[in-house]
Amino acid sequence: MDPSQFNPTYIPGSPQMLTEENSRDDSGASQISSETLIKNLSNLTINASSESVSPLSEALLRRESVGAAVLREIEDEWLYSRRGVRTLLSVQREKMARLRYMLLGGVRTHERRPTNKEPKGVKKESRPFKCPCSFCVSNGWDPSENARIGNQDTKPLQP
């Protein structure tokens, strides 16, 4: 078979023909590959303003912010869970995405911030303690009544 039949740009005596002949010889294969590497490396430039920028490096320069990536991951997990297919891996990914979201400050817990509107040295009138448990709330117990249970020989606090 003649190689010119398969490749119409094949020219006898060209470097392409030399590389094909040498590639058949196992001992010369490493020499040819090093020569081609040297040729490819000679095309590189040090100048940063050169116009030949690879698309791969452009893609690396346009990285997304971490927060946007986490939000996209959460949305992807939400869409995945809406399909009805839930595996151990999808559950683990969803938990990790939520954890990352919370760690990056996406979830704000309700915090009580003290406000000092009164001048210093003036104490605010304290409100009586009100027990928030369900038993005290449902029975209408008062903490002052709880304190009087053991002191039966004293007068009641009510006038």
From Swiss-Prot:
Protein name: Developmental pluripotency-associated protein 3
Tissue expression per record: Low expression in testis, ovary and thymus. Expressed in embryonic stem and carcinoma cells. Highly expressed in testicular germ cell tumors.
Pfam families, per the entry: PGC7_Stella (PF15549)
Region span, Disordered: 1-31, 140-159
PANTHER family on file: DEVELOPMENTAL PLURIPOTENCY-ASSOCIATED PROTEIN 3, DEVELOPMENTAL PLURIPOTENCY-ASSOCIATED PROTEIN 3-RELATED
Gene Ontology cellular component list: cytoplasm; female pronucleus; nucleus
Annotated function: Primordial germ cell (PGCs)-specific protein involved in epigenetic chromatin reprogramming in the zygote following fertilization. In zygotes, DNA demethylation occurs selectively in the paternal pronucleus before the first cell division, while the adjacent maternal pronucleus and certain paternally-imprinted loci are protected from this process.
Classification lineage: Eukaryota, Metazoa, Chordata, Craniata, Vertebrata
Record's subcellular location: Nucleus; Cytoplasm
